[in-house]
A protein has these predicted regions:
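Active-site donor-binding loop signature of nucleotide-sugar glycosyltransferases
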Residues: 24-26, 162, 227-229
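Conserved double-stranded beta-helix
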Residues: 165-267
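Short hydrophobic-aromatic micro-motifs
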Residues: 22, 143-145, 204-206
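A structural signal for short, well-ordered beta-strand segments
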Residues: 113-115, 143-145, 225-229
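Catalytic core of non-heme Fe(II) oxygenases with the double-stranded beta-helix
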Residues: 98-101, 124-195, 236-242
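Glycine-rich nucleotide phosphate-binding loop and flanking beta-alpha elements
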Residues: 28, 137, 212
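Non-heme Fe(II)-dependent double-stranded beta-helix
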Residues: 1-16, 23-129
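A conserved hydrophobic position in a structured secondary element of the catalytic/binding core
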Residues: 92, 160, 206
Length: 267
């Protein structure tokens, strides 16, 4: 099926700028966002997760994969998600996959999903809170679904439009994925950056080969569901691995694109 008018608009915006911001229910009208919110909030209620949140709020720096102590991952380092979960229904919905596949120009793989609570911390930006770009593939679509309202103080996702690999602004700043501090700010003043504040239910599509950062709240917290869509050439899919486990029968997915998305090389 051809993309709808709004889907085609998102694809075009991604091609031109590398980023598009919409409301989830405008793209996937049948999804009940409150069901996704309720599921996500329930994941935060375990004693271990609550203890970790309190630890960070009290100034602690608990051990974390990659050193990102400020991110609470209630699903663990390798998330396990039910195929029937409402959030997977959205992530593997035909409208979202039409957008992703339309942008990538091929069927895509769902390489990773995760639930992040970014807790407010003092001090300068660290790790992915700094400007960077993702090297895993020549084009990568990440979606960030805001599960709570996100304002300037909650660590909104930030992007430099046009710096994605296919975009009009070549990536010539530094040799590495993390430029030196201040380089991006000097080259791209605030007027050339996009700060993605938004209400709960906001869905950010972005090609993260472009410069981006986020997730450093100075007050409150940022709660998002993140999904990563790539080609077969991305790490770790090229090695026959995926960064999450899907619980349930893949055969229950009706869409060929959805079944392909959760498969691996050789399936």
């Amino acid at each position: 099926m051809s993309p709808s008018q709004i889907e085609a608009s998102v694809i075009h915006e991604l091609q031109e700028t590398g980023i598009a911001v919409v409301q989830l229910t405008d793209i996937v009208p049948h999804v009940i966002f409150s069901d996704i919110q309720a599921w996500a909030e329930a994941q935060l209620q375990s004693p271990e997760t609550q203890e970790r949140i309190t630890n960070i709020e009290d100034g602690g720096r608990p051990r974390a994969k990659g050193g990102k102590y400020y991110i609470v991952k209630p699903l663990g380092d390798v998330p396990v998600v039910e195929v029937e979960a409402a959030v997977m229904g959205a992530s593997l919905s035909e409208p979202i996959l039409r957008i992703v596949c339309g942008y990538l120009g091929m069927f895509s793989r769902l390489a990773a999903v995760d639930l992040w609570l970014n807790v407010a911390t003092p001090g300068p930006d660290e790790f992915s809170q700094k400007w960077h770009r993702d090297p895993e593939d020549r084009a990568i679509i990440k979606t960030f679904l805001y599960l709570r309202d996100v304002d300037e103080a909650n660590g909104p996702f930030c992007y430099v439009p046009g710096t994605h690999r296919p975009g009009p602004i070549g990536q010539k700043i530094g040799r590495y994925n993390y430029p030196d501090d201040g380089v991006v700010e000097k080259r791209f003043p605030p007027a050339l950056r996009k700060v993605c504040t938004g209400k709960a239910g906001t869905l950010v599509f972005c090609d993260t080969t472009g410069f981006h950062k986020g997730g450093h709240p100075t007050a409150g917290a940022r709660f998002v569901f993140n999904a990563v869509y790539t080609t077969n050439g991305a790490e770790p899919l090229a090695k026959g691995q995926r960064l999450f486990h899907l619980k349930g029968a893949r055969s229950s997915l009706k869409s060929p694109a959805a079944r392909y998305a959760v498969g691996l090389l050789g399936d």
